């Protein structure tokens, strides 16, 4: 569940509502490519803009059409009660794992974030992935907090932000995390432009926005990493440098991937 390529698709919109037909077209690309898992309703999946009913519907569609590929569903919300309700919806839909970001309006402190994860893992019957995405949550996990949360019995993985641009520094960062996190907790890199560094450094998987639209090239990277072919990992990432440059130019991946999906005819042009 928490290794290889976890592809994070868009939740496309049309006329202000989720475009189910377009969502299924995106899913078909991922199932055809046989990605290792699906990360649905993450930041790329616009979870924060959807109602509970809309999220439940997208969750049901994802699991129904995943063709036995495990689905991880994001349950991020501002209130703990809402998070628990979303967790229940996700599990009823058939989620294999839950992706939990520490979402808040007021800035959260570390004890509050720990309590959130403690509460969710106590109620959940599937493993939880720690979603460390300071770009959207505006909360930064300290290593000490990651270690506290990772020690909870229900935690299965941590989705880390991009690793350092220098490979030696990325190696050091992964070694530091490996030295403190439980062996049972996998480490998945995000921040697509630095995914190659993370995979070469030893991340178990890639939580990938790029993989949600271009799954075959992303899977080629994770498979090369698993085989120890670091030269191929680097070459595949170098091919995508124009895409990484667009991510930097436009303040992240979301707008770029949305535009690309429209240009490919998979979604409305302004999805």
Residue locations for each model-derived region?
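Catalytic alpha/beta core domains of metabolic enzymes, predominantly
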Residues: 122, 134-241, 247-248
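Generic alpha-helical structural context detector
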Residues: 7, 223, 258-262
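Active-site beta->alpha loop and helix N-cap motifs at the rims of alpha/beta catalytic domains
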Residues: 1-140, 146
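A general structural signal for well-ordered alpha-helical segments in protein cores
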Residues: 23, 55, 59, 83, ...
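Conserved short secondary-structure transition element at the edge of the structured enzyme core
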Residues: 199-202, 241-271
């Amino acid at each position: 569940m928490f290794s290889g390529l976890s592809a994070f698709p868009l939740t496309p919109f049309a006329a202000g509502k989720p475009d189910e037909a377009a969502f299924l077209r995106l899913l078909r690309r991922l199932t055809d490519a046989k990605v290792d898992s699906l990360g649905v309703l993450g930041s790329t999946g616009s979870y924060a803009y959807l109602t509970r009913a809309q999220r439940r519907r997208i969750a049901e569609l994802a699991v129904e059409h995943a063709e036995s590929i495990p689905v991880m569903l994001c349950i991020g919300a501002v209130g703990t009660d809402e998070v628990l309700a979303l967790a229940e919806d996700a599990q009823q839909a058939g989620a294999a794992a839950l992706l939990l970001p520490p979402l808040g309006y007021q800035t959260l402190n570390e004890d509050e974030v720990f309590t959130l994860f403690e509460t969710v893992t106590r109620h959940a019957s599937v493993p939880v992935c720690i979603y460390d995405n300071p770009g959207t949550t505006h909360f930064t996990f300290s290593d000490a907090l990651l270690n506290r949360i990772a020690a909870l019995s229900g935690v299965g993985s941590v989705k880390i932000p991009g690793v350092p641009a220098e490979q030696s520094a990325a190696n050091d960062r992964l070694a530091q995390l490996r030295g403190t996190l439980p062996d049972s907790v996998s480490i998945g890199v995000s921040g697509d432009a630095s995914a190659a560094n993370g995979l070469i450094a030893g991340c178990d998987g890639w939580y990938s926005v790029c993989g949600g639209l271009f799954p075959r090239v992303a899977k080629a990277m994770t498979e090369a990493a698993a085989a120890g072919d670091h030269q191929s990992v680097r070459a595949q990432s170098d091919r995508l440098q124009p895409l990484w440059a667009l991510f930097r130019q436009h303040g992240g991946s979301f707008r770029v991937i949305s535009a690309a999906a429209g240009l490919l005819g998979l979604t409305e042009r302004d999805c």
